Amino acid sequence: MPGQTQGAKRWRVPGRGWRWAGILLLVWLGLASPAAGRIDPYVSHYLRTTEPIELPWDAEGHMLTFTPEQLTDGKNRFQSACLNCHVGGSTLPAPNISLSLKDLRGATPPRDTIQALVEYQRDPRSYDGTEVSYGCRPVPPSWMDDEALRNLAAFILRAAQVAPGWGSNAIGGG
């Protein structure tokens, strides 16, 4: 009929709407997936940590909670800053002093709490506490802030508690 326009035909590609729905679902699942995907396998398996755990904060018995993600961050920091001298919790420059829980407790002052490990990392002292330790470099806040250093300390302490062979100086199965 004259004067009337017919609506333009719209072409639809079959399944196009479903494709977009599928893509959006995948994106949503990626963003909403549990944090377990960000947990290092070493942390979940050897540190036996898939849920938040409590570690000793200070010698008075106060505890601090750490998530598996924080322990993963601590592990990554350990690998980038400490691994050259502390493979598997051993201490290559001083093999008789490891990062085992026994050796951490035996230091003066003891280094078996998060607070003590952070203090040590800021100002390394000899095992008996009498002099500056030149074997371990100080970690200034400009390098690692307090939260990062607590995560590193938490990784070391948790590994000393439960990781098989940690601090045993049995590198390479020897």
Swiss-Prot record:
UniProt keywords, alphabetically: Electron transport, Heme, Iron, Membrane, Metal-binding, Photosynthesis, Photosystem II, Signal, Thylakoid, Transport
Residue positions binding heme c: 82, 85-86, 136
InterPro entries with a match to the protein in the record: Cyt_c-like_dom, Cyt_c-like_dom_sf, Cytochrom_C550
Main location: membrane
Signal peptide: 1-37
Entry's Gene Ontology BP terms: photosynthesis
Listed Pfam families: Cytochrom_C550
Membrane topology: Peripheral membrane protein
Entry superkingdom: Bacteria
Co-factor: note: Binds 1 heme c group covalently per subunit.
GO cellular component: photosystem II; plasma membrane-derived thylakoid membrane
Needed cofactors: heme c
NCBIfam families: PS_II_psbV2
Family: Belongs to the cytochrome c family. PsbV subfamily.
Free-text function comment from the UniProt entry: Possible low-potential cytochrome c.
The protein, known as: Cytochrome c-550-like protein
